[in-house]
Amino acid sequence: MLRVIVLVSGGGTNLQAIIDAIAAGKVKNAQIVGVISNNKTVKSLERARNAGIPAVCVSPKDYESREVFNEALLAKVKEFAPDLIVLAGFLVKIPETMVHEYSNRIINIHPSLIPSFCGVGYYGLHVHEKALERGVKVTGATVHFVNEGMDEGPIIAQKAVAVEDDDTPETLQRRVMEQAEWLLLPKAVDDIANGRICVVNGKVKHTNSEN
């Protein structure tokens, strides 16, 4: 059974998608053993507790420096002994020590088709604002492994979503979540849990093997 922890900063809709997929049997051989947020007031913590999942807050505001926070975050992660760390809208840069310790065991969901509209400053609604400003006809979401760069790790899966002429950042954001993010992230967890993904020479390869 793959031990999964989910790191979140906001409402936790992607977290909920994984919870629901596990409950429905769409994600097999995986269990969410903990949820960590950097904000104690967000709904994601409530979602976790409602599902019987231990949920804690580790906020940079509670520590004297980023270095001390990074140590506290890594220590809390280790307490859950995860096999996989899922960043589901986690707006804090992951410490390099954690990236190295959990190499190819941290995945992130990003609301664009990487390499478009990604990197420093591209998160949340801002991604969709920039997509509309550029006038793209297709956007989407990407699940990728996390490395030392920002949105630069090996791509696991992508799903395209059409941009409508009357879209606002809010309507586009919602459709990307519904049509891409909420499908891609649980599927990636399932693929990893069941041995269908490996990283070869910096690229993700998909296989049909089962654990």
Describe these PLM feature segments:
Residues 56-61, 117:
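Short beta->alpha connector loops at strand-helix junctions that form conserved
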Residues 199-211:
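A short, charged, Gly/Pro-tolerant segment at domain boundaries
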Residues 88-201:
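Donor/substrate-binding cores of folate-linked one-carbon enzymes
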Residues 1-43:
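N-terminal Rossmann-like dinucleotide-binding module
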Residues 33, 83, 104:
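Conserved acidic residues
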Residues 41-46, 95:
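Short, glycine/polar-rich helix-capping loops at beta-to-alpha or helix-loop-helix junctions
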